[in-house]
Amino acid sequence: MSTEGKVITCKAAVAWEAKKPLVIEDIEVQPPQKGEVRIKILYTGVCHTDSYTLSGSDPEGIFPCILGHEGGGIVESIGEGVTSVKVGDHVIPLYIPECGTCKFCTSNKTNLCSKIRITQGKGQMPDGTTRFKCKGKEIFHFMGTSTFSQYTVLPEISCCVVREDAPLDKVCLLGCGITTGFGAAKITAKVEEGSTVAIFGLGAVGLSVAQGAVDCGAKRIIGIDNNETKFGPGKDFGCTEFINPSKDLPEGKTIQQHLVDITDGGVDYSFECIGNVNVMRAALECCHKGWGVSTIVGVAPAGAEISTRPFQLVTGRVWKGSAFGGVKSRSQLPSIIDKYMDKKLKVDEYVTFTYPLNEINTAFDVMHEGKSLRSVVNL
């Protein structure tokens, strides 16, 4: 029986309040309105960004809400006026949309899009309302995606149609972390062949930077992390050497000083994949004078500020930032999926655990314990 135009009752992991475990609830999902798409989510990754909002540290965090932003699913129904997505399409929800008409999309200078930014930041659909209810209460959306639900509703401009032979339990992870790191090296920094790269933080994003650097032809890729259990995966993903700053530094040397010493004046490119403002400074200051480029990928706590001596920039170092790897979400993500399908991008190797929806809190636990690169939840 068709569910088109009808309210769907399904399971979702609801975040009723900050700092509390998610609760599996029966929720009601309204039909898509004009310009919207309703998706049956099959798989979703669990990311540190979900945890950040659940912790109560996110200034845009609104409760109760349905978290999740690394999803993969199939279009169940479409609203009036939707033309680029059809029922049955395999899609990845996008937390950075691509409308193609705003000044950001038409600038050819950024992958950001302003079309629905205000309402998305309020946990709402573009018309200022939500599509979720639970126990008679309105439930807010998260990052415009809310993939911790068996069904979700997105604006059409927040859906990337993907090839049907791409396994959704793997490519769902391209909705955030892997693409973020890979694109930071390929698109934002534009790492050059034969260059030296330093990566601070070897989680899923940092390992993806390594993949991007390899794809660009970098000669030397230095992975930096206090947790040496990450060095094995780091090697598998392309790092050529490693530094543990808690034990490997010469006496009296900072990590940036040590990197400058061992790279003949500094690295060509560095990437901060942690979200620590002190590490961001180190990542800039380990860059080579005259041309070194440091890209901030990690998300720092709200209100945190970065600092360095202006002379670091005056003498030619460049500080950049990257969101979703600079990847235009609807038009460029399919080519990254193609790269995975052509076995030129590792994705399967990130999946450490797979859980059913009712064990989603365990996925958060193993992430906090540093035991997983990514956990995938089967909805």
From Swiss-Prot:
It is an enzyme of class 1 (oxidoreductase). Keywords: Cytoplasm, Metal-binding, NAD, Oxidoreductase, Zinc. Its cofactor is Zn(2+). Binds 2 Zn(2+) ions per subunit. GO terms for molecular function: alcohol dehydrogenase (NAD+) activity; S-(hydroxymethyl)glutathione dehydrogenase (NAD+) activity; S-(hydroxymethyl)glutathione dehydrogenase (NADP+) activity; S-(hydroxymethyl)glutathione dehydrogenase [NAD(P)+] activity; zinc ion binding. Zn(2+) 2 binds at C99, C102, C105, C113. GO terms for biological process: formaldehyde catabolic process. It comes from the Eukaryota. Its EC number is 1.1.1.1, 1.1.1.-, 1.1.1.284. It is found in: Cytoplasm. Homodimer. Belongs to the zinc-containing alcohol dehydrogenase family. Class-III subfamily. This is Alcohol dehydrogenase class-3. It comes from Dictyostelium discoideum. The lineage of its organism: Eukaryota, Amoebozoa, Evosea, Eumycetozoa, Dictyostelia.
